[in-house]
Amino acid sequence: MSARFADAFWPPADELAEAAGRIRARLGDWPRGAAPWRLCLAAPELPADGDVLIVSSGDRAGQARASAVSRPASPDAVAIEFDERSAVLHAAGARHALDAAHPLADDWIAALAAFIDCGFAPLDALVLALAWRDGDETLDGDPWPVDAARFPRIAGLPAAPEPAFAPCPARLGLYPVVPDADWVERVLDCGARTVQLRVKGAPPELLRREIARAVAAGRRYPDARVFINDHWQIAADEDAYGVHLGQEDLETADLAAIARAGLRLGLSSHGYYEMLRALHERPSYLALGPVFATATKAVVAPPQGLARIARYARFASARAPLVAIGGVGLEALPAVLATGVGSVAVVSAVTGAADYRAALVALQQCFAGEFDNR
């Protein structure tokens, strides 16, 4: 039995542990997650932090226990219901339903354990496990799931907006994210051509003036792309180039109205499940992050790191232009670009620099050098 997974299952399951060990051995070097976890195929006698209860659709008692996990009173519990072609993860008072693209692999639970051992949260690990097929670990080359046709889809989503969102260039280049219209004008004057205005806490009249000024600044440069963070209604009124929304905005924003207005749409994502959610809407670009720790914005998701960003890029690069964001400065920029993204958003590397003009020149030169060498 694989010693690495000896305590990964309840009740103990030698065959699952062996299969998980074989799969994990082919997934490469990943730091193990700090949080404890265990996959429970039956209700444990002594529940522990990190337990993930797994029940089949035919197990009525198990389904009742799994459904209870969706209640806000069970914020730390996780349960997964599954049948031949679907799975539902219950956690933190929420229900996440996934329809598989093919019948679940016999080894999907072992694959789930292997991906959790790589440090992925149960929801993202479940997405990968549903894309896994029996025997993938025996194939030559890299067995990591990357084929979008094999990935599950999120069940119950409405159809993507029609018409589709206007497209963006595949490489958006250096992408400063700045707090006001003065900064928009500065970075455009220094040669940046993709910029995002992210105003926080401004009263309505000031907010509208800032957005109008930022859009007007962009119009002075025929190749400028000014995105507005969050405030899509004002962005549409001002005929902005585009808008950037977070995952939380997908439940409230009128995406069809944004598409009809001709705005480009950028969406944030912090893992495989959120990539599936964002890509369903066919956005103009997809943001991946945070790459590193950042103090410029409160982000629930932990830093993803370069290895994950590279995996995300291999999965999503054929479906949308990609922007990496979060804690990126000049020193790390070449390594971030090497992950396969076509753009990197920067915040404090510009707005916190002692000489923002020099910082922008250095960042742009780094971009040009990296892309020229590809």
Where in this protein do the model-derived segments appear?
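Charged C-terminal helix
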Residues: 1-49, 58, 123-170, 369
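Glycine-enriched alpha-helix->loop->beta-strand junction motifs that scaffold or abut catalytic
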Residues: 51, 74-77, 189-194, 237-243, ...
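Catalytic cores of alpha/beta
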Residues: 226-241, 270-284, 314-323, 328-346, ...
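Short, small-residue alpha-helix embedded
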Residues: 101-122, 126
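Glycine-rich phosphate-binding active-site loops on the catalytic face of alpha/beta enzymes
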Residues: 118-121, 136-140, 193, 198-200, ...
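Alpha-helix-loop-beta-strand connector modules within alpha/beta enzyme cores
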Residues: 208-230, 247, 255-270, 301-330, ...
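Hydrophobic faces of well-ordered beta-strands that scaffold small-molecule active sites
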Residues: 40, 53-54, 67, 170-178, ...
